[in-house]
């Protein structure tokens, strides 16, 4: 969110973020209760200078719990302007769970949810390759993009989603290995 905020401030990126909590128990209700606004307090060194800045992040348009708002979650795939998926579901988040079904609302695993979303997008736009998504997993595991892609292929096979969808995913969607550029500590309760 902070990176999107800065891109909006410094370029004509002009984008927003929909937060989707990856597990049933999450904090989207708290985020929604504060109008999807929060602050980032940057402390440390920037170009050799000590910094301590507080910035209100205002790029979240809404936050969803797919376990109670699955229809709204799936409708994200119908937005033609949607381009990016950025995830950080912890190291355990990128895992294939063979118990997940295409008909689950939603699948319990993150790769399962993402496959459901991608398949719905594929069907919504009739396989239009210009509607593929750019996917940046930020989970702290080696070759996170490769592992996420591997799990999606497993769901394509398990759920028998077909060669056309597999080809669309391979050709229209980019899944990249990433490395986070900073560690964000938890809420500084003792300082607030």
Feature-to-residue mapping (PLM):
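Substrate/ligand-engaging "lid" and interaction regions
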Residues: 2-192
């Amino acid at each position: 969110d902070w990176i999107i905020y800065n891109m909006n401030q410094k370029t004509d990126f002009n984008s927003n973020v929909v937060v989707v909590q990856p597990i049933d128990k999450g904090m989207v209700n708290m985020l929604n209760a504060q109008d999807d606004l929060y602050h980032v307090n940057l402390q440390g060194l920037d170009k050799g200078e000590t910094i301590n800045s507080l910035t209100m992040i205002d790029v979240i348009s809404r936050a969803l719990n797919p376990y109670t708002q699955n229809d709204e979650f799936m409708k994200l795939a119908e937005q033609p302007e949607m381009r990016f998926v950025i995830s950080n579901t912890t190291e355990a988040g990128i895992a294939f769970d063979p118990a997940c079904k295409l008909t689950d609302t939603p699948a319990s695993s993150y790769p399962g949810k993402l496959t459901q979303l991608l398949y719905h997008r594929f069907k919504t736009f009739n396989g239009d390759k210009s509607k593929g998504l750019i996917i940046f997993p930020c989970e702290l595991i080696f070759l996170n993009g490769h592992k996420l892609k591997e799990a999606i292929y497993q769901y394509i096979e398990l759920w028998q989603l077909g060669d056309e969808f597999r080809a669309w995913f391979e050709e229209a969607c980019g899944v990249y290995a990433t490395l986070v550029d900073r560690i964000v500590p938890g809420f500084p309760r003792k300082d607030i």
